[in-house]
Amino acid sequence: MLVVAACGTGDPPEPITPPLPEIDLAGFQQLLAQLDQPAIVNVWASWCLPCRAEAPLFQAAHTQHSQDIAFLGIDYDDSQRGARLFLDEFDLPFPHYYDPDGTTIAEYGGIGVPRTYFFTSTDQLIYTHNGAIDQATLALHIDELLNR
């Protein structure tokens, strides 16, 4: 009887609001075209341990460089609930989008998550980083974007 009570479903969880806006390839390309500055796009998922490890690096980089570089996040292969909890936990202040079927990131290549894309102010992809990024690599590519 105790086991049954402990395994009960109870009340359904509260919905996570607001949900991340969904984005597809056309919407992503339009978003990039509207930016007048270089962009760093981090692809992540809430269940991804390396994504969780690198999140503070992106928070710090955004704080330091948000006047000169646009930061965007794309949640991939995840739930809206997991995504919102991840963003709340890491307090990532830049825009994030939900790519439910992966079409946006498939266009730009790379493997798995995390993945980070570096775009010039003219929307040219200059570097794709697969896997967790470290501080030195992130700083190197930020410098490349700023000095183009």
For every predicted segment, state its role.
Residues 19-38:
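A short beta-strand-turn-helix
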Residues 8-16:
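Bacterial lipoprotein signal-peptidase II cleavage site
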Residues 52-90, 100-106:
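Structural microenvironment flanking redox-active thiols in thiol-disulfide oxidoreductases
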Residues 40-41, 71, 116:
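Hydrophobic beta-strand anchors of alpha/beta hydrolase catalytic cores
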Residues 86-93, 100-146:
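Thiol/disulfide oxidoreductase modules built on the thioredoxin-like
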Residues 36-39, 44-47, 112:
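Short pre-active-site segment immediately N-terminal to redox-active cysteine/selenocysteine motifs
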Residues 46-53, 115:
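C-type cytochrome heme c attachment motif
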